[in-house]
Amino acid sequence: METTRQLGEWLGKEKKTIIYGGANLGLMEDIASAAKANGATLIGVVPKILEKNGKVSTLPDKLIHTVNLSDRKDVIVEESDILVALPGGIGTLDEVFHVMAASTIGYHHKKVIFYNVNGFYDTLLKALQQMAQAQFIRGLEKNEYYLVANSFNELINILKKPNLTDNND
C-alpha cells in the first residue's frame, strides 16, 4: 500500500520512534520497513503467542516481551505519545477501543488518529456518532477521543501539532 510506505518514509526522515506490535506481517510491517530504512527507531511489543508462532519481525531495534495481548496493548499505550489507526481488522479495532475506553475513565488523555484511507473508517465513525447522539458516548462532540485524517497531508499536519498529547499521564 502506497500510503504505508509514504508514512513510514516520513516517520523515518523525522527520526521518530515507532512502538508497534512487532509482528512480521500486515501494514505495520510495511511502515516499519520504510521507516527503518529512513532512520526511525523501532520498538516491537510482542506477546508470547507471536514468538511461539514465529511471527516476530526482525526489524525492531528493541523488543518488549509481554504475556498476552492485553499486556501488549497496555505497553503500547503507556509508551506511545500518538496512536495512529491504519485500516485494519479485529486487532486494530481492539486496540482503538482499548485506547478510547481507557481515555474515557481517565487513564490517559491520548487520542486515536484514524487514518481514514479511501473512507475506510467512515462506517465506524458514523456508528460512533450515533452512539454519541444516543448519549452512550460522552465527549465525542469535543473530539476528546479521536481525530480523523482523510489524506496523507492531513495526517502529517495532525502529527506535527505541538500539543497533540498529554504527557502528564
Label every PLM stretch briefly.
Residues 25-85:
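Acidic/glycine-enriched connector segments
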Residues 21, 86, 114, 148-149:
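Active-site-adjacent beta-strand anchor residues
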Residues 78, 82, 133-169:
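A charged, well-structured terminal subsegment
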Residues 26-33, 120-130:
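Glycine-rich, charge-decorated loop segments at or immediately adjacent to ligand/cofactor-binding or catalytic sites
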Residues 1-41:
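Glycine-rich beta-alpha loop segments
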Residues 46, 86, 103-126, 139-141:
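Short, acidic/small-residue loops that bind anionic groups at enzyme active sites
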Residues 10-17, 81-83, 109-111:
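Short, surface-exposed connector motifs at secondary-structure boundaries
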Residues 71-106, 113, 164-169:
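Active-site/ligand-binding-proximal alpha/beta "capping" segment
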